[in-house]
From Swiss-Prot:
The encoding gene: C1ql4
Effect ascribed to mutating C32A: Does not affect homo-, nor heterooligomerization with C1QL1, C1QL2 and C1QL3. Increased secretion. Does not impair inhibition of adipocyte differentiation
Induction info: Down-regulated in fasted animals.
Entry protein name: Complement C1q-like protein 4
GO cellular component terms attached to this protein's record: collagen trimer; extracellular space
Length: 238
């Protein structure tokens, strides 16, 4: 009886202080106080955490998303002036009195003649860039087009040298404002070169364009030899 009291009294005292954990070590009971401080040294001071050496450098992360678009910057410096444009067609007659009529037999001077320097193939406008004659400046070598400056009747002729040798043929059309007005064909009959030629007389109004368009095949470029040529002139004005 006395032994039971000796065991029960300590248990009642500890249970009144709070929850207590204990373990059995053989025949001895070890009581653990949950309120005891943790992570302290022998003198009650906080225990220091041992420092570890730095690890290896990690890899570069992925690139982030692009940010919001910023405001437009200031305008840049002014660029150089462009090249002068082509002269426009003559305007309509003004309200003033008409000028004197041209003398009888007067013919305006409009004529051009140009050769082809570089080869062409496929489907493109032939730009006869080796200009020999351009009276009136109505022909433009950069575009290969003649633009009518005065209404009237005009004559045009073209001769195009085919670059063959592979069994193909070549077609060349004279165009007026995108419509075919004359055609020529050269066929490769076991030859390396052959000619396609034609001529036409057309009535033109101011601003009408006349040019030669390749409709398949290959055209030989003659450097300055002028194997392929395009020419035209006015016969009489309206």
């Amino acid at each position: 009886m006395v032994l039971l009291l000796l065991v029960a009294i300590p248990l009642l005292v500890h249970s009144s202080r709070g929850p207590t954990h204990y373990e059995m070590l053989g025949r001895c009971r070890m009581v653990c106080d949950p309120h005891a401080s943790r992570g302290q040294g022998p003198d009650g001071a906080p225990a220091s955490v041992p420092s570890l050496p730095p690890g290896a450098k990690g890899e570069v992360g992925r690139r982030g998303k692009a940010g919001l678009r910023g405001p437009p910057g200031p305008p840049g410096p002014r660029g150089p002036p462009g090249e002068p444009g082509r002269p426009g067609p003559p305007g309509p007659p003004g309200p003033g009195p008409g000028g004197a009529a041209p003398p009888a037999g007067y013919v305006p001077r409009i004529a051009f003649y140009a050769g082809l320097r570089r080869p062409h193939e496929g489907y493109e406008v032939l730009r006869f860039d080796d200009v020999v004659t351009n009276v009136g400046n109505a022909y433009e070598a950069a575009s290969g087009k003649f633009t009518c400056p005065m209404p009237g009747v005009y004559f045009f002729a073209y001769h195009v040298l085919m670059r063959g040798g592979d069994g193909t043929s070549m077609w060349a059309d004279l165009m007026k404002n995108g419509q075919v007005r004359a055609s020529a064909i050269a066929q490769d009959a076991d030859q390396n070169y052959d000619y396609a030629s034609n001529s036409v007389i057309l009535h033109l109004d101011v601003g009408d364009e006349v040019f030669i368009k390749l409709d398949g095949g290959k055209v030989h470029g003659g450097n300055t030899n002028k194997y392929s040529t395009f020419s035209g002139f006015i016969i009489y004005p309206d």
